[in-house]
Amino acid sequence: MALIYTRIYAQPVEFNRALGYAYDALVKGPYPFDAMSTWKGLSERVAQGIYMGQGLLIPHTRVSGLQEPLMAFVVAREGITGIKTRNDEKAQFMCVLLSPAESAMAHTVTIANVAKRLLDPEWKEKVLAATDEEELKKMF
């Protein structure tokens, strides 16, 4: 998995804005892919619901021909707004994931690894306390 982009927002951030910046970074990442069809797949997934609990949003889709999973990780201490969560829980983390369409395993393993980290209270606390993107990137 290639972690392409990390971002820390100290203030609340609107979901579409955070997703847009993260997706733009993935498009400019190391592996070419069809940005328009991938965006369509990502948008369809968002419409189905992407809140996983524990404050985590995972907009994700599979991309034909992609060499390895690409990920962007966003932390918003004060929350990500404009997106549906269960019981009005505050979403503070967003993992944008693009996975090779040809490998269901890569997709599943990457999502499981991120979810596992967020279930660790110490890791979650460190991520929320991170002061810059490089520090955040090192936590992966």
Could you say what each language-model-derived stretch is?
Residues 1-140:
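Cytosolic covalent-transfer regions centered on His/Cys nucleophiles
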